[in-house]
Amino acid sequence: MARTYDSQELCPIARTLDIVGDRWTVLVLRDISLGYTRYSELLESCAGISTNLLSDRLKKLEQRGFVERFFYSDHPPRAEYRLTEKGEDFRRVLRAMYTWGTTHEGRNTDRPLAEMLKRR
């Protein structure tokens, strides 16, 4: 069952988790940050995510203003996803998670992520 919070009464951390705390959401944002912008690329980069779950996460991220969808083909409809200003700002959270993970849980082996974190 999905969590629901009264965001008016909760701390900022709880409100943030209400948006990005579902399984896979942060990883989808990570991969869009790394340049995986098409649905098929995201499906491959998030190994193990189901198609319906990826669609759900992208839809929610779009509704919450983290990503925008741009169609590059009408027939069949094909879209790319890009971070909005709000999504770009979330990179700071990704960097903090990356730093914490490498400090406390071992060395980084993901070069593209390390390069992304050096930017901005």
Q: Which stretches of residues belong to each language-model region?
A:
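Recognition helices and adjacent regulatory flanks at domain boundaries
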Residues: 1-11, 19-23, 45, 57, ...
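Short loop/turn motifs at secondary-structure junctions and domain boundaries
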Residues: 7, 72-73
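Short amphipathic alpha-helical/adjacent loop interface patches that line ligand
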Residues: 36, 46, 58, 87, ...
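Amphipathic alpha-helical dimerization/coiled-coil segments
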Residues: 91-120
